[in-house]
């Protein structure tokens, strides 16, 4: 399992659809956890509804977990996208 942390920093022109297209390249399962006080919400990023339910916004701190044969690349791609990278 590959785990990393990131801070959301998305421009307005980035969409959930773009993220789902990035994830379609990988076979690994990628989970994002968003902490809210003592609790957290989590969603499988291959589920658009799950991602929407997290209600991510700029400045949110998240944990990204990947499991599978290409987990390192999948987690890195998600972290780069969500933190505002190319």
Regions found by a protein language model. Give the residues of each.
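C-terminal structural segments of small proteins and small subunits
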Residues: 57-86
């Amino acid at each position: 399992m590959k785990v990393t942390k990131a801070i959301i920093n998305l421009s307005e022109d980035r969409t959930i659809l773009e993220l789902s297209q990035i994830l379609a390249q990988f076979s690994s399962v990628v989970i994002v956890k968003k902490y809210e006080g003592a609790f957290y919400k989590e969603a499988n990023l291959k589920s658009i509804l799950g991602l929407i339910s997290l209600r991510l916004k700029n400045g949110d701190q998240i944990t990204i977990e990947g499991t599978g044969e290409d987990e390192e690349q999948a987690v890195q791609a998600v972290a780069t996208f969500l933190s505002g990278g190319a």
